[in-house]
């Protein structure tokens, strides 16, 4: 190793010592720095973090930005965060700051937190899992070896967390990278099942509105999202959706035709008005990302055999929507990258808002089926909350989940939905109100929410 590299490593260690200060926690000695990853640098903490928090940040060798936060009285537990989305386009450092600010409760609860922006924009689950593990290695190498590492996946990031756990904490792995997995409002059905309803939205919207694409525009199969090189903007699509459905129009000013069409979309797909445009956006630009960059121009989704109900005239709707068959090669390729296998060898604890309109609560049943089929059903406990928000539930619920998961991972004390609910109530004294857990709730099958269909 060159003297310059040794000096850079020594400088990084000195910076960390200065960051923590004489009165800060005494951390284990860092391991020798790897050749590929530079040490994180002192970084300004986002507003709202607990007093005394120290932050570091950087950009990894793959190009992902990251932030790390260490509370004043760190007890050795690291929460490794996989964010939702995903974002399209190149990574932006601001994303890591936004995530840390949103999940400041983890730092307030005494845990170190680390989150990556992911190096590759778009629906690339396995690549994001590798980015997440790379950040863990940066933490271990340059900061400390945590006593316990919990992998936390939120929304789309839950699929990232599952993929990372399958790869780095599989059953029988002698030294798993993670001690437990926390999943919150997760997209848990993988890419080949979680997005079926968004194809349904595209075909139903086009049947009703006929403006995405318009008749005078180049026609394309709707599973494509958009053709390569298309110039449609989000503002353009929002204007088209408002023209047809009245999404941005006050209810009293909507025409009867707009209201009827919107009523069909909401009733058939079982989604609220407020989520229609977001799902339509995803089924446009994220579908484009998947088809153009992940499946070689082939469709991983289809709606052959799907029977839509809830409209004024179901027979006309089912006869009139466009129908597509999923391509077996695309399903296999996209599934390998994005579908969970369930082969996770450490405890998994999930929470899901039962009225989540972004990631349906019924996805929890799909996860349960997958994990049980892999022989790991005893490693999964699922909890549910009386919430409709997707991005964040409430402050006390996450420390409660963490405490229960740590007891399971460290002492073998497997939680139950009831024990998590009790713990949450106890946490309200410290973290404020917000416990709405439903210990007796069970999620229905995904097919009760999304029309079953033929699959390759």
Model-derived segments and their meaning:
Residues 23-25:
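Bacterial signal peptide processing site
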Residues 73-74, 135-155:
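Gly/Ser-rich "nucleophile elbow"/oxyanion-hole loop immediately N-terminal to the catalytic nucleophile
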Residues 28-46, 187-338:
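Accessory cap/linker subdomain of secreted extracellular hydrolases
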Residues 148-209:
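Primarily recognizes the serine-hydrolase "nucleophile elbow" in alpha/beta-hydrolase
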Residues 76-85:
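Short beta-strand element of the alpha/beta-hydrolase
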């Amino acid at each position: 190793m060159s003297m310059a590299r040794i000096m850079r490593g020594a400088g990084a260690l000195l910076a960390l010592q200065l960051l923590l200060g004489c009165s800060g926690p005494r951390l284990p000695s860092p391991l020798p720095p790897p050749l590929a990853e530079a040490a994180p640098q002192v970084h300004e903490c986002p507003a709202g973090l607990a007093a005394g928090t120290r932050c570091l940040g950087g950009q990894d060798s793959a190009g992902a930005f990251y932030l790390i936060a260490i509370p004043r009285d760190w007890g050795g537990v690291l929460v490794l965060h996989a964010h939702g989305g995903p974002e399209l386009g190149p990574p932006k450092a601001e994303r890591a700051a936004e995530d840390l600010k949103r999940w400041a409760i983890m730092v307030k609860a005494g845990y170190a937190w680390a989150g990556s922006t992911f190096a590759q924009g778009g629906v690339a689950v396995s690549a994001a899992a590798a980015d997440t593990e790379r950040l863990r290695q940066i933490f271990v190498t340059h900061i400390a070896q945590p006593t316990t590492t919990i992998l936390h996946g939120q929304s789309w990031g839950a699929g990232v967390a599952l993929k990372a756990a399958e790869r780095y904490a599989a059953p029988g792995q002698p030294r798993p990278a993670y001690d437990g997995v926390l999943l919150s409002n997760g997209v848990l059905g993988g890419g080949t099942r979680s997005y079926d309803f968004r194809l349904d939205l595209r075909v139903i919207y086009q049947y009703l509105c006929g403006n995405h694409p318009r008749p005078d525009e180049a026609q394309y199969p709707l599973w494509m999202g958009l053709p390569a090189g298309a110039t449609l903007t989000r503002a353009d699509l929002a204007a088209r959706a408002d023209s047809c459905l009245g999404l941005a129009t006050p209810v009293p000013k909507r025409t009867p035709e707009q209201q009827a069409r919107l009523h069909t979309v909401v009733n058939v797909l079982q989604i609220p008005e407020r989520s229609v445009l977001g799902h339509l956006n995803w089924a446009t630009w994220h579908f484009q990302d998947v088809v153009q960059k992940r499946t070689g121009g082939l469709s991983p989704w289809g709606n052959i055999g799907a029977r839509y109900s809830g409209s004024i005239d179901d027979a006309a709707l089912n006869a009139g929507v466009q129908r597509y068959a999923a391509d077996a090669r695309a399903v296999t390729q996209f599934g390998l990258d994005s579908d969970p296998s369930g082969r996770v060898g450490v405890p998994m604890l999930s929470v899901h808002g039962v009225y989540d309109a972004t990631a349906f609560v019924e996805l929890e049943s799909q996860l349960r089926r997958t994990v049980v089929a892999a022989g790991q059903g005893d490693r999964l406990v699922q909890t549910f909350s009386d919430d409709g928000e997707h991005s964040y539930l409430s402050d006390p619920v996450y420390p409660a989940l963490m405490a229960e998961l740590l007891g399971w991972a460290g002492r073998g004390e497997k939680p139950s939905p009831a024990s998590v609910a009790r713990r949450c109530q106890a946490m309200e004294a410290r973290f404020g109100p917000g416990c709405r857990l439903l210990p007796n709730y069970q999620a229905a099958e995904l097919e009760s929410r999304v029309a079953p269909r033929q699959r390759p």
